[in-house]
Each structure stands twice: as structure tokens, then as C-alpha cells.
């Protein structure tokens, strides 16, 4: 699509649909369920060899030889949208947004047992960026040819189109793309720092080199990779340089990067541009809010005056969203959706909503208010706006439709997406050719054979109208850059409210006290004589609801190491499990699960919890082994 301007297995997916239907019926929005689905979209977009834990089973390995013709391995990364090009600029922006969520919303993501999924989604991108940056002043910025790719309609596993790779170097600069990739890696280093310090340091090293490359050799990446102009035309690179400097300062604390953002604030537009858009192309509002955090924390020092200028522009963006900007406001549809432009408008709404949720937190922490031309606004007002956009996306709109695929009883079923619109290679093993895909699948009036859960489509027009038509790519195509901000937005609205998938007062389901009988929470202890260790499980039911004729229960299990020494490589046996589970990884052996990679060891006295949902009695949890 051209873009102008600037064990979770089958049973769990079926259950998710049932739960979402119950949500819509009650006119509440299940932010936890929506959050869970967004990660499935990123799994559907994966390029390369897929991991054993891949939950989107209709996808197979693809793009395994990417870059080899140019002498570099560029396997991995994400396909951009409904096509199979790996565009570096929007992919890097998506990883930056995922990382921002992991950093600023770690509490909410952890309480919803989604931190692991967030880190995996980030790493699928950052591992690719590391491959794409083999030398300090080289960055491979794109794989695939947008023109030839769009002439074909085929599964990624069947690709016959060009997989040419395009690079940036001192003779072919791209400060915007290199700067955004530096920002992504710096933000990701912060996300991984509490869980994997060595990987965090590696990411930061690449981020520093890429920033130096972007700053020293300046130019638009679309001049060096002309193939990208028709799809992701960059409007400038100054915002990305400031954006990268802001993230590197936050990741390192090095005053060099803050001084860079201060010294170049006027020249590069950071304190000059008041904008009404935040997107893969325009980062000014993000820069302004990120740097305002320093001022709000009282750490401005000698840069206080310049930081105040940055905050003035941050306020301009926020006030424009809230329609309190003295007439210079962002347009909204009759239904209340912010409207920036016709092509894939929801990407702007999702990004702005998350940005205002972030700014709300920064203001609240400083006990400050938003100063608009039309009056002062409490931080809660910004969060309320963010919630209004999220609710519109999830179904509070004229169409009564969720624009997140797979959420709720009504959502787009004819998505402009090659992989989802053609039967899986595991269901139809014969290849689907370039033209055959158009004839047999693109033009079908039926819904997609593979539901691409969690995808945020382009969305409705300025009058809240939406046409569920595969050929209507302006409205029906999902993108990485549009879906990524939803992770932080839904996590924030979930609010860390244990026992409920709603955020704040938004209760997703009818909840009642669980029946006593066989659902009584009881601790169980595992104490093998050979080691003297003691592992305790504490089961509890945190909520329940009715979907159809079945009552479902949300079970929380706390694993506690009651011994005096650490244990590692813990493997659990879970029997009688009939629903989805969060917080544990399947091992490949029947009924066997293990802790995630970032939680390989339980210290003495440490606890870890996981969650599962099912109807009927609780599952049986026991220990198989540990070290």
C-alpha cells in the first residue's frame, strides 16, 4: 500500500472471540484482551525462521535468503503491512513505540503478564536491526521492492518478487532512517536493562554508532533509497536526530545528548515547530514531550529555559488534540475520532492517544497541569482523551465495529493483507502464484480464511464511514506503525488492575463472587527430599463472567520459592488446562511449561505468578524438575 504524508493456540483464539463478544454486549472495553491480541499481529508479521513458541499457526518461514545476494544476512524483522517489504523507517518507529511502552508501562504490562510478549516483540525487531548494522557507518534500510511486491498477491511463504536489499552508507546517507533506528535501539536498551543487561548494552552500542552516522552524514533516506519514495516518503530528518538524542540521553544519562538537543533546538525545529501529528514521519511531538519530562522532574539545570520552550510546543500538541488550542485544533470526525488524513488515519489516532497518555503521567507525577489557550487541563483530561480514542477503536463508533481485527463481535473480515486472505501454506500446500492470488483470493467477497488477530486497520473516513473491502486499502490495511502504539495505550488503560481486564472504572465483564465449593483457593507445596527445597503454589480466582452459557474463571497462580537458596530451570506440569495461559512458555512436551527466559531463576523467597482462563475447576499444577 502506498502511504502518503506524513498453550495460546486455536482454543485460546476461539475463547478470545467469546470473551470479546461478552465485552461488547456489556458496552465495556476489555483493554487486557485487546492488548493480548496486538502481540498476535506482530507474530503474523514476522519474517524469517519462526520460533517454536509461534502462536500464529497459519504462518510459516519466509524471507530466509533476504540479503544474501548482497553478501549480508537480513533474515528476520517484520513485514510492513499487508505486503512483504521490510521498510526500515516504520519498522524502527514501531519498535521505538513498543519499547516506550515497556519502559513507561512496565508495571501495567507486568501485572497483565504481557511484559514477556512485549520484549519478544521488541527483540524480533532489534535482532534484525543488529544484523542490518554490520559496520558503524552502514545500515541496511530496506528489503524488497515495493512496486513489484504490490503487483503480486501471494503468501510470504510463496514470495516470487524481488528481495533486493538497500543500504545507507557515507555516500548514500539517511539521517532520518538511521536516527529513528538509533532511537529504537536506545529505547529498547532501556526496556531490556532490568532483564538482560548484556543485550541492553549491545543495543546501546549500536544506537550510539547509528546516531553518530546519522548526524555526521546527513541526508534524506529516500534520496538514497528512491524505491521507498512512493511508500514512506520522509519529510525531513531533523526531528529524528532530536528524537534519537532524547532517547540516548534517557538511556545513558550522558549530557552530550541533552546538549545536542538543546544546542540544535531552534535550528532543527524542536522548539520552533508546533505540530498536530505524531507518526512514523513526524517525531516532533514525541521529542517535545520526552524532553518535557526532564523539566517536570526538576532536572533542567542550565537548560531550563530551552526545555520550557520544548514544553510549550508539547502543550501545543496536547491542547490541539483536546480542542483547547485557541482554534488551532486537530480535526475530529462526528463520532469523536481525531482525523489527520484519509490514508490509514487510525495510525495517527493511536500514536497521539498513547503520547497523551504518556504526557498525562509526566504531568501527574509533577503535580502539574496542561496550560492551554482555552484554559488549564488536569492530567486526567489527557488520559480521558486517550481513552476516548481507544474506545472508538474498540467499537464505540458509528459502525459499532472494532477496528482491531478479532476483537469484539464485529470487526473487519476482508483485511487488505496477503497472508491472511489466502489459505495457510499448511492447509493448501501448493504454491499460490503472483497473478493467481489476485484472481482466486484478492477479489473474493468472502472473509479472510486466516483471522489476523490484533491488527489495527486503516480505519474510517472523516465522516466515520468504513467499507469492509479488501481492495479498499486506504481503510482496510493494517500497519506496524499504526498497531504498535496500542500496546502502551491498552496497557495504560488496563491500569494494572489485578483481577480485571478493564482499566479504571471500565469493567469488562459482569463479575460476581466465585462459587465456593471446588473453586476454593488452596496452597499446595512441593518439597522433594533430595534437595530440601520447597516450592509453594497459591491458586486464586480473581474474576469470573458468563459468555454464552458458560461461566469462565480467571485463575491466578503464585509460585513461591520458600527455600533458602535459588532455583532455576523450573519445569511445571499443568493438567486439566482447557483455556489460554499467560506468563509461562510451553516446552514442546505435553502438559509441560517453564518460566520465561527473563525469569529463569527464582531467588530464595521470591514469587512469580501466571494466569489462565477456563470454565470449570482449576487446573492441576505440579513440579516436574528444577536445578
UniProtKB/Swiss-Prot annotation:
SUPFAM superfamilies: Six-hairpin glycosidases. GO terms for cellular component: extracellular region. GO terms for molecular function: carbohydrate binding; cellulase activity. Its EC number is 3.2.1.4. It holds the Pfam family CBM49. Residues 1-26 form the signal peptide. Keywords: Carbohydrate metabolism, Cell wall biogenesis/degradation, Cellulose degradation, Glycoprotein, Glycosidase, Hydrolase, Polysaccharide degradation, Secreted, Signal. Its main location: secreted. GO terms for biological process: cell wall organization; cellulose catabolic process. The active site is at 83 (nucleophile), 416, 468, 477. The keyword Cell wall biogenesis/degradation applies. The keyword Signal applies. It catalyses: Endohydrolysis of (1->4)-beta-D-glucosidic linkages in cellulose, lichenin and cereal beta-D-glucans. PROSITE patterns: GH9_1, GH9_2. Glycans are attached at residues 196, 465, 561. It is found in: Secreted. It comes from the Eukaryota. Belongs to the glycosyl hydrolase 9 (cellulase E) family. This is Endoglucanase 5. It comes from Arabidopsis thaliana. The lineage of its organism: Eukaryota, Viridiplantae, Streptophyta, Embryophyta, Tracheophyta.
Amino acid at each position: 500500500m502506498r502511504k502518503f504524508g506524513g498453550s495460546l493456540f486455536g482454543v485460546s483464539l476461539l475463547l478470545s472471540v467469546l470473551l470479546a463478544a461478552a465485552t461488547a454486549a456489556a458496552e465495556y472495553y476489555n483493554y487486557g484482551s485487546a492488548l493480548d491480541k496486538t502481540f498476535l499481529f506482530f507474530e503474523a508479521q514476522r519474517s524469517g525462521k519462526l520460533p517454536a513458541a509461534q502462536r500464529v499457526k497459519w504462518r510459516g518461514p519466509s524471507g530466509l535468503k533476504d540479503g544474501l545476494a548482497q553478501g549480508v544476512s537480513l533474515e528476520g524483522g517484520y513485514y510492513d503491512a499487508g505486503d512483504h517489504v521490510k521498510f526500515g523507517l516504520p519498522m524502527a518507529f514501531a519498535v521505538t513505540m513498543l519499547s516506550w511502552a515497556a519502559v513507561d508501562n512496565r508495571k501495567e504490562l507486568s501485572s497483565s503478564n504481557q511484559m514477556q510478549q512485549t520484549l519478544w516483540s521488541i527483540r524480533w525487531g532489534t535482532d534484525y536491526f543488529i544484523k542490518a548494522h554490520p559496520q558503524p557507518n552502514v545500515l541496511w534500510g530496506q528489503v524488497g521492492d515495493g512496486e513489484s511486491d504490490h503487483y503480486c498477491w501471494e503468501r510470504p511463504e510463496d514470495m516470487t518478487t524481488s528481495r533486493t536489499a538497500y543500504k545507507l552508507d557515507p555516500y548514500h546517507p539517511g539521517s532520518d532512517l538511521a536516527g529513528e533506528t538509533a532511537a529504537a535501539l536506545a529505547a529498547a536498551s532501556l526496556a531490556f536493562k532490568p532483564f538482560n543487561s548484556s543485550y541492553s548494552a549491545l543495543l546501546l552500542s549500536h544506537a550510539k554508532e547509528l546516531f553518530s552516522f546519522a548526524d555526521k552524514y546527513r541526508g534524506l533516506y529516500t534520496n538514497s533509497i528512491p524505491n521507498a519514495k512512493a511508500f514512506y516518503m520522509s519529510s525531513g530528518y531533523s526531528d529524528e536526530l532530536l528524537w534519537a538524542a532524547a532517547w540516548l540521553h534517557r538511556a545513558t544519562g550522558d549530557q552530550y545528548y541533552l546538549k545536542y538537543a538543546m544546542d540544535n533546538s531552534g535550528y532543527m525545529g524542536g522548539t520552533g515547530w508546533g505540530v498536530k501529528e505524531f507518526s512514523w514521519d513526524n517525531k516532533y511531538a514525541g521529542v517535545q514531550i520526552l524532553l518535557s519530562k526532564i523539566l517536570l522532574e526538576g532536572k533542567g539545570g542550565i537548560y531550563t529555559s530551552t526545555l520550557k520552550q520544548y514544553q510549550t510546543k508539547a502543550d501545543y500538541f496536547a491542547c490541539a488534540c483536546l480542542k483547547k488550542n485557541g482554534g488551532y485544533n486537530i480535526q475530529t470526525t462526528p463520532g469523536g475520532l481525531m482525523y489527520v488524513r484519509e490514508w490509514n488515519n487510525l495510525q495517527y489516532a493511536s500514536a497521539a492517544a498513547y503520547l497523551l497518555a504518556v504526557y498525562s503521567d509526566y504531568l501527574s507525577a509533577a503535580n502539574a497541569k496542561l496550560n492551554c489557550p482555552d484554559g488549564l487541563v488536569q492530567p486526567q483530561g489527557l488520559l480521558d482523551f486517550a481513552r476516548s480514542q481507544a474506545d472508538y477503536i474498540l467499537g464505540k463508533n458509528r459502525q459499532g465495529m472494532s477496528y482491531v481485527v478479532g476483537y469484539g463481535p464485529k470487526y473487519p473480515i476482508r483485511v487488505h493483507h496477503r497472508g491472511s486472505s489466502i489459505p495457510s501454506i499448511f492447509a493448501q500446500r501448493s504454491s499460490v502464484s503472483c497473478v493467481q492470488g489476485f484472481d482466486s483470493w484478492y477479489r473474493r467477497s468472502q472473509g479472510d480464511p486466516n483471522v489476523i488477530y490484533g491488527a489495527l486497520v486503516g480505519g474510517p473516513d472523516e465522516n466515520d464511514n468504513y467499507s469492509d473491502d479488501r481492495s479498499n486499502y486506504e481503510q482496510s490495511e493494517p500497519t506496524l506503525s499504526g498497531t504498535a502504539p496500542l500496546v502502551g495505550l491498552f496497557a495504560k488503560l488496563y491500569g494494572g488492575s489485578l483481577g480485571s481486564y478493564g482499566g479504571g472504572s471500565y469493567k469488562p465483564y459482569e463479575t460476581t463472587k466465585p462459587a465456593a465449593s471446588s473453586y476454593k483457593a488452596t496452597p499446595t507445596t512441593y518439597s522433594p527430599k533430595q534437595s530440601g527445597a520447597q516450592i509453594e503454589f497459591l491458586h486464586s480466582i480473581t474474576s469470573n463472567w458468563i459468555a454464552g452459557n458458560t461461566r469462565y474463571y480467571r485463575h491466578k497462580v503464585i509460585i513461591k520459592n520458600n527455600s533458602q537458596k535459588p532455583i532455576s530451570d523450573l519445569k511445571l506440569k499443568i493438567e486439566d488446562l482447557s483455556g489460554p495461559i499467560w506468563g509461562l512458555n510451553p516446552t514442546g512436551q505435553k502438559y509441560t511449561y517453564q518460566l520465561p527466559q527473563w525469569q529463569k531463576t527464582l531467588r530464595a523467597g521470591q514469587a512469580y505468578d501466571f494466569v489462565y482462563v477456563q470454565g470449570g475447576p482449576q487446573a492441576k499444577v505440579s513440579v516436574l524438575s528444577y536445578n
